[in-house]
Amino acid sequence: MRETYRRTLQQRIAKRRGLALNTKPNQSISKAVIEFIRSTVVRPIHMLVTEPIVGFVCLLTSFQFGLLYIFVVASPWTFETTYGFSLGAQGLTFSGFIVGTMFSYAAIIAGDRFLYQRKLHQFEHEHQAPGTATEFPPEHRLYNAMLGSLILPSGLFMFAWTAEYAIYWVVPIVAQAITIFGSIQIYVPVSMYMVDTYGPLYGASAAGASSLSRYTLSAVSLLFTLQMFKSLGTGWATSLLGFCALTMAPIPWVFYRWGPMLRARSKYEREL
């Protein structure tokens, strides 16, 4: 992909034009370490707790990531206890995730090409006057996420109440495909929305906050998944996840409607 980091681009332009590069004075090791910690640890955590966009995007992406790990543990257990699947057959049940993932990325590519890119070209045509610094709203990234917010809880509830011995085992596998389809529809667009919102200067820090929350929840989810499914059963354990997804479903819609207001209040100004 093309380089997008502003400082790197400025350095390349200056070098190409034979201009003097603005270099920072040499720092001591202690100051360099402090600066490194500030930009890679302190800033992401600060953005996580002070920036609503970062906080809610991290909540969404962490749930999607944790959901994947939950199903890695819960799905084999469900098909073993409900349908008596062998170890090899349990592995084949993940074919639903494979199919759902393939269709999901096809939908994301289609959404980018036929919705996002079309809106972008229209915006550029309307704001092509010289000196115009108007920025294309990153909220247009959220079309697929709004769709996924409706599909994900539907897939979870479908899996919850079709994973029964009396119902053919293909049905819950289809429900898994629907679930992962909706999950990826949310995960990819909201991550891109956050990076677009904070730009090349602070986008990496926002992504760092997302990584911190994602992997923390993923690690924690493995500690309670099997106990939760054994205690509540597949129906109510997955329904609990469905209710969580349903509670978070409005987030992409809120971003699309009030995102400009939230961005205007941000402490991390995006550089054009």
Give the location of each predicted region.
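Central mid-sequence intracellular linker of multi-pass
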Residues: 1-55, 105-126, 254-272
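C-terminal transmembrane bundle
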Residues: 65, 69-70, 76-272
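Short acidic/histidine-centered micro-motifs embedded in hydrophobic/aromatic stretches
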Residues: 51, 61-62, 209
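A single, central transmembrane helix in multi-pass transporters
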Residues: 56-62, 66
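Primarily residues marking transmembrane-helix entry/exit sites
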Residues: 50, 54-58, 166-170
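Short coil/turn segments at secondary-structure boundaries
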Residues: 11-12, 59-60, 172, 251-252
